[in-house]
Amino acid sequence: MNIKQTLLLIFTYFISHTISAQCDLHFEFENTGSNMTVLFASSASQNIASVSSQGTIGAFYQNDDGDYICASAMNYHGSQTQLPLMADDSTTPEIDGFKAGDLIHWFYKDVSGSVYQIETSPADVFLLNSISIVQSVELSEVDCGITN
């Protein structure tokens, strides 16, 4: 196998791992006692409702293996909503929430099981005890190979 084939194989593996990680999301989290609050303003909520007004919004961080781990989730019903994003509990050895400066990865799963990646404006990083207001969002469906 030559270098180009090896690089193509490695690239394909990482792309497929990223896509499968986005499709295998678990929207459950533990309350760690410390958080950041994020409010989705009505303008952002309207964009989500244009896709589906029933589902779950989740905030995820990536672990060292590149897996997405939920640190907050909320049932969404088509209106303005806010979520507390859990911080890492420094009294435990495992990473169980966001650390300062972590990029926030947003996903939305509608009631039919379709998964969407959410790009927020402004784009945020985690900052303990802060409040962020998301003014607008763009959703792009993640191809999970699910047919409805």
Question: What name fits each language-model region?
Answer:
Residues 1-7:
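Bacterial N-terminal signal peptides that target proteins for export
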Residues 7-10, 16-148:
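Primarily marks secretory-pathway-exposed extracellular/lumenal segments that are disulfide-
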